[in-house]
Regions:
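Active-site neighborhoods and metal-handling regions in enzymes and metal-associated proteins
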Residues: 1-221
């Protein structure tokens, strides 16, 4: 989507604010002993309170209102009976729509304290997001974002999940550009445009660069 009007910007800001608020409340609720389903149930209540719709549920009939991935799960984890434990690495992914505008946000964090290696991965992911964001300017190459992410990961002795990417967003959950890679591709010479709306999603890993599809469901990676 290319945002052009005041209505566009206001609509995008509103749904972005809602997604961020739901994400932050779920993070605060993620304590030892709670299940991912209980977290998702609270997300449903919040969607209703804000007058928003879960994007994965409405668009893809995903079996949850949010994606909650734990430890070995990198993305699209289905909320269920899994109980959160001390030291778990949790990713909460919230995407939603309101009045025809979509937003997508997520964060990874460690439950509890005293897990420096796990905490470092989460911090590098946050740092990579901001490093890439600095390259997101009209007229710059889209590939510059991925280059910034990958370089920062390598400087910290890590790498990226190459098959998971960011994407365009705005009037639907997935729009052009179809992919915003987390590494540099010299063939990717598309330029970012003024007003282009994107969901930029660094995926950082200590070792693996590829995903494996879960054998127990069609969603979890």
């Amino acid at each position: 989507m290319i945002a052009k009007t005041e209505a566009d910007f206001n609509g995008l800001k509103e749904i972005g604010r809602i997604c961020g608020a739901i994400r932050d409340e779920l993070v605060a609720l993620t304590k030892v002993g709670i299940t991912t389903k209980e977290l998702d149930n609270r997300a449903k209540e919040l969607f209703d309170e804000y007058g928003a719709l879960s994007a994965p549920k409405e668009t893809y009939n995903f079996p949850g209102y949010t994606c909650i991935s734990v430890n070995e799960e990198i993305a699209h984890g289905i909320p269920g009976s899994r109980v959160i434990k001390e030291g778990d690495v949790v990713n909460i992914d919230v995407s939603a729509s309101k009045d025809g505008y979509f937003a997508d946000t997520g964060v990874s964090f460690v439950v509890g304290e005293g897990y420096p290696e796990k905490e470092k991965v989460c911090q590098v992911a946050k740092d990579a997001f901001y490093a890439g964001l600095e390259k997101a300017k009209p007229g710059s190459k889209k590939s510059g974002l991925g280059k910034a992410v990958h370089n920062l990961a390598k400087r910290n002795g890590m790498t990226v999940i190459k098959e998971l990417t960011g994407h365009g967003i705005g009037r639907s959950i997935h729009e052009a550009p179809d992919h915003i890679f987390n590494y540099f591709s010299r063939w990717d010479d598309e330029l970012l445009k003024d007003g282009m709306v994107i969901a930029f999603e660094p995926f950082i890993s200590t070792k693996e660069e590829s995903i494996i599809q879960s054998t127990t469901d069609d969603w979890t990676l």
